[in-house]
Amino acid sequence: RFPGTTLDKIEIPLDDGSFIYDTPGIIHRHQMAHYLTAKNLKYISPRKEIKPKTYQLNPEQTLFLAGLGRFDFVSGERQGFTAFFDNELQLHRTKLQGASDFYQKHAGTLLVPPTSKELKEFPELVRHEFTINEKTDVVFSGLGWIRVNEKAKIAAWAPMGVDVVIRKAII
């Protein structure tokens, strides 16, 4: 299973007698899937309904998205951030101060994927800074998103080549 590999139109019947159609997708080179091994695709390809997780963060706290990315709450009022990622992806909260050292020490061991062996080929994380003024999703392309509910300054880190964008919250 590799995201974006539907080869032909697939007709999916719905209960009311209508249909939806799954069509071949577009390969987007700025998605996480292109930086993972086949065995690690399970962390970004949900097989069950995603269970959002809400984290109450104080300013200057960080959420690691396993070893695949990082979300820094730089400043703002304490608030809940809701993470929408595959249920298998482990998120880890820590203080912003020392977060880079924490990543260097634990990427590939506590923060997996990627494993320590895969980390040698994994692109470095790149920082993207955003000032949020309304309910907004911070999207890690091909991985998931974090909903920011109130005004905040945040930094989102993703592997070089993976897009991080913001959009008006969809949920």
What is the predicted function of each stretch?
Residues 1-171:
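Helix-rich effector regions associated with P-loop NTPase G domains
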